[in-house]
Amino acid sequence: MAANQKIVFALVCLFLACDLVLGQQQAANSSDSDSDVAESRTFGHHFLRRISFALVPGAFVVGVITTLLAALTVVSIKGLGVGVILLVLAIGQMLSRALPVQAAAAYAAAPVPVQAPVPVVYSHSHTQQPVWLEKEW
């Protein structure tokens, strides 16, 4: 209960301090109110001139920041695309290793054809008969 009383006392002190500060500001503003009447409360000519000078550099900075963010976005999306492709390949590899292999239907292999002997000629002379050697496969 004592903690609640301390909190309430601190809030009351804070409220009184704020009220005192605001009261002093209102007293100071009442003496300056005569000079404020002469100047309009809308944005004057000088303010618009200052804003127009600051508008071009501000737009340039905003454009540069936008361009850099766009480039960063493109590079990030490119990296994301490569990562997704690698992820799909890895998942496919894991699935191919995890799933059982279904054997294809067994077909009888065709017999290997017997090849004719290959002539090998050791001489450049056309008068001699070629020597026939059989190659064993």
Curated annotation (Swiss-Prot):
Regions that span the bilayer: 7-27, 55-75, 76-96
Any one of the GO BP annotations: liquid clearance, open tracheal system
Annotated localization: Apical cell membrane
Chief place where the protein resides: membrane
Keyword terms, alphabetized: Cell membrane, Membrane, Transmembrane, Transmembrane helix
Gene Ontology, cellular component aspect: apical plasma membrane
The keyword Transmembrane appears for this protein: yes
Disruption phenotype: Dies at second instar larval stage. Shows reduced larval body size and shortened dorsal trunk probably due to defective membrane growth in larval tracheae. Results in defective tracheal tube maturation including liquid clearance and gas filling resulting in twisted and uninflated tracheal tubes. Results in mislocalization of crb from the subapical region to Vsp35/retromer-positive vesicles in the cytoplasm. RNAi-mediated knockdown in the trachea results in a similar phenotype.
Membrane topology: Multi-pass membrane protein
UniProt miscellaneous comment: Apnoia means lack of air in Greek.
Role noted for this protein: Transmembrane protein that plays a key role in trachea development by regulating crb localization and maintenance at the apical cell membrane. Required for anisotropic apical surface expansion important for tracheal tube elongation and lumen stability at larval stages.
Complex formation: Interacts with crb.
Name of the protein in question: Protein apnoia
Lineage: Eukaryota, Metazoa, Ecdysozoa, Arthropoda, Hexapoda
